[in-house]
Amino acid sequence: MPFASALVPLWNRDAEWRRRIAMVEAAESFVYLSTFYLEHDAYGLAMLDALEAAQRRGIAVSLLIDSFGQGLGGVLMSEEHRAALERRFELIRSCGGSVQFYTPPRFAQRLLGGGHHIKIQLSEAGEAIYGSSNITRSSFAGWNEYSVALRGPVILSLMDTLEALGVKIDSNHRRALASIAQAEHADLDIDYRFFDPNHHSGFLGPLFWPGQNSVTEWMIELLDNARESVLITSFYFKPTRWLMKAVLRAARRGVRIEVFHSHRDALPSTDLAWIAAAAGFGKLLRAGVTIYENRHGEHSKLVLVDDRLAVFGSYNFEDAAHDRLSEAMMASTDVRAVQPVREIFAELRGHPDNVRVERHWFRDLPIALRLRIIRYARFKWWM
């Protein structure tokens, strides 16, 4: 189990953004950054400006973006903006920096949305930012997100994750971080799990994959061992069937389950992700699960078990997180990790943007939307 010497919660969107940019601007040796996608907007361009400037002053810059994620985000961009981003990536490369796109090894994985979904940023200063945020306006001026700034030996685990995703890690960079971590008093317990299904599924990729995802299994274990309460945030709550069964088991034995996810209005480009989630509302509500929908978007990935164990990272409660995307989650019982998450759930519960889903939710919908749910709910795995 890795330990941290410091953990700073980054729920406030401006605070996380300022910390990310400050890390790049203050870097003296290297910066590593991974993201699901980077948007052609004020935030994406500002980060590319900072990375390019760092590389030009001699900092070793390594940027990892998911191919599928960038393609998905690119659907919302104009052809001109997509081309402009490619030029910016080439500029960083021309200065000696690394810009990589994670691509799964098998055709079926690539075809069906396999990729990496892990967001890590670290530098030689000995700090890493880890959590749910992409480098986009949505993450910093739209949705709720949760990241943490970490110091200590746990950073080496994050560096190992980047290497597992295909990032070339300079051995000198690893030694530099190890030296800093060893010099700091690390007493904050961290349980860290990482899994990439693309290195375990067969030639059909996620189709009919019977394998076990260690992060999914961990979430199931936490639900099965919960005694009083489990509070969850997810972009859209549409867990794989094994995880859904664990949620229902816990609720039926009296565990208070509260789910906070996004309202259909939070993703104006499509309602299909929400429809996939809505397909499970009936059985969740009948089991006693409380569901809240955030109108401006809930993109954090938090779990609070029995008010004493906080879990955070990149894992959405969805099929893709189980069988298509590499994901990572951290957990801790240390009050420094738990108290900020307690406060977040208290804030969410009382926030006017969070609308509770009532038992009569379906009949209150417009007829056209009800018909779309009936038509498309069967395709949940694909959405």
Can you say where each PLM-predicted feature lies in the sequence?
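Charged, low-complexity intrinsically disordered terminal segments
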Residues: 1-383
